[in-house]
């Protein structure tokens, strides 16, 4: 399942972490939600994944955008869908979907202060109007916003050397800033049992919180790596973070049935 040495596997503390990770995955595979096993280190932050699904071969647009919200510990907080423009990947109007998901989030997490929006796609494919609309909506809800582009197609597996050998890298998660653009950063795991998640490339398109961009990078690097371990469809540690995984499943499902998400479904099982 994981490529590692027996010496590392049975080293002090490593076996405990491996069992803890596998226990979460076993619970997910059996249909449970193991968020109670995770540390809720940031109760004031919620992650919202945004993804889209397109059918370019159909006569009708048949396009859907899925939005799913989870807490940093993996607790499911809500989901919704909207339509996309037939000729573009951008949303027709993001204001038609964010308010409803924020309402669901506030009902379950009244102490939320920061929304971290994970938008699938490269930063150059996301319209400025979408970013400004998201800022306006969260401001009206008295929330701060961190808007991140996250291109799923940029994933690959990689392992990092020991923490002491790479300047600025912290164990077990590390972020690496790209020299061409300080708002772009990669997320790596320094633990072989985790591998590298998908996607690894993120870009900060907006940050209205009191955190600096560097603090945001470290915070989301830790949280997103943890959220990857809560997805278990195949024996691979290169999964999407939970909110993007949920949004991807939701968008594809609603595109297929050509019908919006049913609000009566309170807790779906996206596996």
Stretch-by-stretch model annotation:
Residues 1-271:
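Long, contiguous domain-sized segments
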